[in-house]
Regions:
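Cysteine-cluster motifs in flexible loop/terminal segments that predominantly coordinate metals
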Residues: 42-72, 199-205
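A short beta-strand-loop structural module common to alpha/beta enzyme folds
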Residues: 32-42
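Glycine-rich phosphate/pyrophosphate-binding loop and the adjoining helix
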Residues: 141-205
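Helix-loop-strand module that forms the ligand-binding subsite of alpha/beta enzymes
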Residues: 56-147
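Short, hinge-like loop/turn segments at secondary-structure boundaries
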Residues: 51-55, 132, 161-162
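N-terminal beta1-alpha1 ligand-phosphate binding loop
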Residues: 2-30
Length: 205
């Protein structure tokens, strides 16, 4: 079993990575293999709604989105970490997630999702809520902790001084590992829940 962790910060070893690494360590202690991928300062463009992914099975723009897609497909869990930019996630990260979730045809149901956010001071809950939307629209159960998944600090060293934040990340890792194992066991016994054909309703006719 494996979890993929995406560091949405331009800083490879900053606050967001520090939080993700704590989660990864707990996942590993509980039998879950982990991989952390870094967005860094890569130029990841947004979705242009061209619809070519429906024909190709992948995004028409061959950048990091198509590199991450097979890793996501093979993973049992996905942790997305972001610094807070104006009370929201990093724009480069949301570009990646918009295209990653929309362009990939594989079934995401019952992959466990979790969001982690870091900030010097405020905006964390709004950013956290936005990231969770990717999971809930994809039938992905969300792993939680004893508080919303956030850390505070202006540097990686500051984050490690946020004792409550560090504890939140540890608990998140353990809870996510439990969910991944539980879902894998149930899937082995009874398979996935019944999948319905999507019904689309437009409000303007």
């Amino acid at each position: 079993m494996k979890a993929l962790l995406i560091n949405g910060s331009p800083h490879a070893n900053g606050c967001t990575f520090t939080a993700l690494n704590i989660v990864a360590e707990e996942l590993q202690k509980n039998g879950i293999e982990t991989e952390i991928v870094h967005i860094g300062n890569k130029d990841i463009r947004g979705c242009i709604a061209c619809g070519k992914c429906a024909e190709l099975g992948h995004c028409v723009f061959n950048d990091m989105v198509n590199e991450v897609a097979p890793k996501f497909e093979q993973a049992d869990g996905l942790v997305v970490g972001s610094p807070v930019y104006y009370a929201g996630p990093n724009g480069t990260l949301t570009n990646l997630l918009d295209r990653l979730f929309f362009s990939t045809p594989f079934d995401k149901r019952m992959k466990v999702g979790a969001a982690v956010v870091s900030a010097r001071r405020g905006g964390t809950t709004a950013a956290f809520d936005r990231l969770n939307k990717y999971f809930t629209i994809s039938e992905m159960p969300i792993a939680s902790s004893r508080y919303w998944n956030m850390v505070h600090g202006h540097s990686a060293e500051d984050v490690m001084k946020d004792e409550e934040g560090v504890q939140i990340m540890r608990i998140l890792g353990r809870n996510m590992a439990f969910l991944i194992r539980a879902i894998a066991a149930e899937r082995e016994r009874n398979g996935l829940p019944e999948k319905e054909v999507t019904r689309y309703t437009n409000f303007i006719r």
